[in-house]
Amino acid sequence: MSILYVSPHPDAFPSLRALIAARYGEAGDGPGWGGPHPRICLQPPPSSRTPFPPPRLPALEQGPGGLWVWGAPAVAQLLWPAGLGGPGGSRAAVLVQQWVSYADTELIPAACGATLPALGLRGPGQDPQAALGALGKALNPLEDWLRLHTYLAGDAPTLADLAAVTALLLPFRYVLDPSARRIWGNVTRWFNTCVRQPEFRAVLGEVALYSGARSVTQQPGSEVIAPQKTPAQLKKEAKKREKLEKFQQKQKTQQQPPHGEKKPKPEKKEKRDPGVITYDLPTPPGEKKDVSGAMPDSYSPQYVEAAWYPWWERQGFFKPEYGRPSVSAPNPRGVFMMCIPPPNVTGSLHLGHALTNAIQDSLTRWHRMRGETTLWNPGCDHAGIATQVVVEKKLWKERGLNRHQLGREAFLEEVWKWKAEKGDRIYHQLKKLGSSLDWDRACFTMDPKLSATVTEAFVRLHEEGVIYRSTRLVNWSCTLNSAISDIEVDKKELTGRTLLPVPGYKEKVEFGVLVSFAYKVQGSDSDEEVVVATTRIETMLGDVAVAVHPKDPRYQHLKGKCVVHPFLSRSLPIVFDDFVDMEFGTGAVKITPAHDQNDYEVGQRHRLEAISIMDSKGALINVPPPFLGLPRFEARKAVLAALKERGLFRGVKDNPMVVPLCNRSKDVVEPLLRPQWYVRCGEMAQAASAAVTRGDLRILPEAHQRTWHSWMDNIRDWCISRQLWWGHRIPAYFITVHDPAVPPGEDPDGRYWVSGRTEAEAREKAAREFGVSPDKISLQQDEDVLDTWFSSGLFPFSIFGWPNQSEDLSVFYPGTLLETGHDILFFWVARMVMLGLKLTGKLPFREVYLHAIVRDAHGRKMSKSLGNVIDPLDVIHGVSLQGLYDQLLNSNLDPSEVEKAKEGQKADFPAGIPECGTDALRFGLCAYTSQGRDINLDVNRILGYRHFCNKLWNATKFALRGLGKGFVPSATSKPEGHESLVDRWIRSRLTEAVRLSNEGFQAYDFPAITTAQYSFWLYELCDVYLECLKPVLNGVDQVAAECARQTLYTCLDVGLRLLSPFMPFVTEELFQRLPRRTPKAPASLCVTPYPEPSECSWKDPEAEAALELALSITRAVRSLRADYNLTRTRPDCFLEVADEATGALASAVSGYVQALASAGVVAVLALGAPAPQGCAVAVASDRCSIHLQLQGLVDPARELGKLQAKRSEAQRQAQRLQERRAASSYSAKVPLEVQEADEAKLQQTEAELRKVDEAIALFQKML
């Protein structure tokens, strides 16, 4: 047995780090070291078993006499699951190692230095403000990195996040108040996201962030660190402060200029915020936007997004017919067809829909730009149960009416009116998202064309016997008075006794308990009894048997016997069945076939009667008084009291359980026996599974194929009837034959049900079935409607009018791709495949790509009651916190839920949601998408992509100035032949971006595409190429300048085309301002060819190697300039190289270094030649070092004075740390985490001393 020894102290962050790693090891594939999960011990190991020296906590003993590992980094590394942050060569693994090292060497010392004074553990001479400044400095790199990253290395927590979060636990608990957390908003968001992960929460609980008020008890051992000061010491410190204040006042006086001397220029005032920039030129809807004027100073989403969409729509760019005589015209590029997952017409789209549409539209635009005949078909789903519930709530809220008071026809009129209003809003949202849908083909699942398909499908399947009528157990909502599907059932996990609100009950109802009671054995002289237990005691009134295991020795003597029901005049047989678990409870279970799925199956095997004891509203039936007519949960209390009164109650205890809740009504779902319509799924499921096995249907990510086969292999028949009014009314009729020779039928008897496309057709079929004339047949159509998923399952071909043949059906069915969230793989995707194969003989699509589910920044599921359901338009336009509140008040939430949602909104969006724009939202959502993982969406990251849009804007604006008004681009993008090294380099990098983008689209790897494009524009084009271009465009070499302009134009042209699928608005706006290569160029960017590797084949390894050297030198120079505060000077730089080849390369890129590093002269030293005196040195690569000239730019004497003071302070700090650690009581009294922090601080201080000594030596040579 492995043992993990940890400190019990709640702030012992090294031990917490190990415990959380152990939790991840349990949740994953086991600890990375391959051993078993360790046992936790909250104390130091026995001295007899510890190695020498004694290990620090946490410590891991890998089995008796086995290897000892101690210290948080090593222990966490071993306990963390393999492959989730361990060593490796991948970029993610390198990032993990980088951030773990940063946490251990930078964050922990800074965090302890800032926190310990706050806890009363300040050492002599320690400055709390300086410590806080050091913490801020350590947090800055994290803040920058997390601006565009959810986690430190990848899309899920790794060892890096674990190390950094635990390092910052103390500051977040005791130091960083709300104002500080606003400064480091990205760090705070990331910290909260991590600590709310289940593995963190299991160890840390709820982490309370510092509010500004502190109450801390001084820890044992603090007297070693901060002994109480004597009055003499306090007096001495006061004198020091007084002297310091006088000195500072004197310095301030000396800095003021003498009378008559010119005063320094006042600082420039910040530019006035121009406010919101809007497009105000009169442009009729559908007309092209006027871009002939000057570009605004900065990017504005409102300005950029104006007018483009109506023009795109009027021009027909989104139609598959665009640019060709008809959709059936042969196209060597092929056909791309995808139908939208029709959003429910239940209100507004949320960010989950926005993700779906961002991905789908990006794919659609990419295929369209590749020249394929492209159709993305829009539509809207009637969402039967969801829509009916919302409209019923609205009617009750506004008019105090329910649907039964209104009547079926009048109620349906209300739903249609509501649909017209909400359907338009959903389409408006889709257009604001830039979705390039063909709106002329928009469909609604209740449209006549689609309704005809639904009727045809039902009738065909019923005639073949695939659809049948049967009485079975269904999920029943007593509030909705309807059966509901599995996807409409939420499973609430309870750990024990819990009181839950249930609609229709004034008091909360008890769940999470197991009640035991006794059944007396019939005819037993010894008063023998069998004890059973249940979580639903009221259902014992429907018990028909008691079951035990056939091999249970305790009950063998009861074979053939019965027990007596205490409230009913019936005996219950004791049956023997393998499903019973002998080890659970008494090994005996009650059997209630009409109210439990397992019991129903036992009843079928033993031919037991199923007695329903609840009606559709949840009131008890078929039971004696006093239980008859009681609501089910009132009956629960009555049955319990009656059992106690008869002496049959045997106890109650907490019981972990799952309570099924209707996600529409929040009612507790009951399994009830009801006659319903079912679809036989066995054969269709086999065909769907085989299609994936053969490779005819491809499901991506491939991990979902396992789920697919599992579902198909274990599928049950599908209940498709719903007791609602809104939806497709089932085209089935109950038959009454007015002929004495034909006995009357009963509901479950399928022979007395007939289906038909019309009532007349159904009457003819019924007459033929019973051999009578049609006039002797009376028909009553089923009141129920079809499950929404039935009509949705027909959507890929119902939108084209199946079964009628049409041009669209022949061209676009089967479709190319189905893209949707992985949560509806079974409920929608599987049913489309099964029904498509059954009814058309074809798969509805060739590929299925399943994206992740959007959660909030803390990993929580989107829920209106949590206040984290975000309208994408609120991210696009921005919204105040009050605006978010107002939306809640206009919703159908209960008042209690509104208050809870307000709290969630205030916590997540205290300042509201900033305006981000459509392009930033789309790009951010696609950048988030990682195959197979859910998305914890943080709106602040979306704001970061708005800044990226501003970068595009400014870069293009600069480029247009550089190109000049008379610039004429070459007819092709082919190089001129006189390109400079940096021209060749940027073309090479552009080639790589084109390759990665196309490969990413083909593989549905959206993060790879967005990363490639973001990096090209920001880090290569803007940060490097444009900077290197400035001296060329301002120089005298006209050939070089013209080559540069042509290359720059190519970068803009290709770069905007690359980005267009993700950012259609800003790229169109900028593209329209560029000159065209030919007069016949397409009118819009959205129908311009997408860049392909064959067009952009300028890979140049030689140029890339040269610029990589230039960038390495630049980074080193910038680092030295920052170290010596040379922000306003251009120091000379001398390059020391290891060989002539490196020297030649360095000479070739020296001009680029000069531009990028803001250096003066950049010269390459001859081999072996010494560098000039007074240079600071840094290493750029293994073949090149740089010498930055400081002579004349800094005052050596002044710098030496500052360095000597810094050295003295560092020495004093090191001495204090050494003395503290040498104290006799240190190891016994000081907490272990403080000891580790002291050791890290000492190492950091010694490293600083070495750097200071090097700098002192340099400046002494300059004197």
Curated annotation (Swiss-Prot):
- Activity regulation, free text: Can be regulated by protein kinase C-dependent phosphorylation.
Task: Set out the biological process GO terms recorded for this chain's protein.
Answer: valyl-tRNA aminoacylation
Binding-site residues, ATP? K864
Occurrences of domain GST C-terminal (ranges) = 89-219
Chain positions found as N6-acetyllysine:
K644
According to the UniProt entry, its GO molecular function terms are: aminoacyl-tRNA deacylase activity; ATP binding; valine-tRNA ligase activity
Q: Which domain of life is it from?
A: Eukaryota
Map motif 'KMSKS' region onto the chain: 861-865
**Bias category Basic and acidic residues: which stretches?**
234-248, 259-274
Keyword terms: Acetylation, Aminoacyl-tRNA synthetase, ATP-binding, Ligase, Nucleotide-binding, Phosphoprotein, Protein biosynthesis
Spell out the reaction equation it catalyses: tRNA(Val) + L-valine + ATP = L-valyl-tRNA(Val) + AMP + diphosphate
Question: What are the EC numbers?
Answer: 6.1.1.9
This protein's GO CC annotations: cytosol; endoplasmic reticulum; mitochondrion
Top enzyme class: ligase
Q: Does the keyword Transcription apply?
A: no
Which InterPro entries has this protein been placed in?
A: aa-tRNA-synth_I_CS, aa-tRNA-synth_Ia, Anticodon_Ia_Val, Glutathione-S-Trfase_C-like, Glutathione-S-Trfase_C_sf, GST_C, M/V/L/I-tRNA-synth_anticd-bd, Rossmann-like_a/b/a_fold
For this chain the motif 'HIGH' region maps to 343-353
UniProt keyword Transmembrane helix, yes or no? no
Q: How does it assemble?
A: Forms high-molecular-mass aggregates with elongation factor 1.
Give the family from UniProt. Answer: Belongs to the class-I aminoacyl-tRNA synthetase family.
Name of the molecule in the record: Valine--tRNA ligase
Q: Which organism is it from?
A: Mus musculus
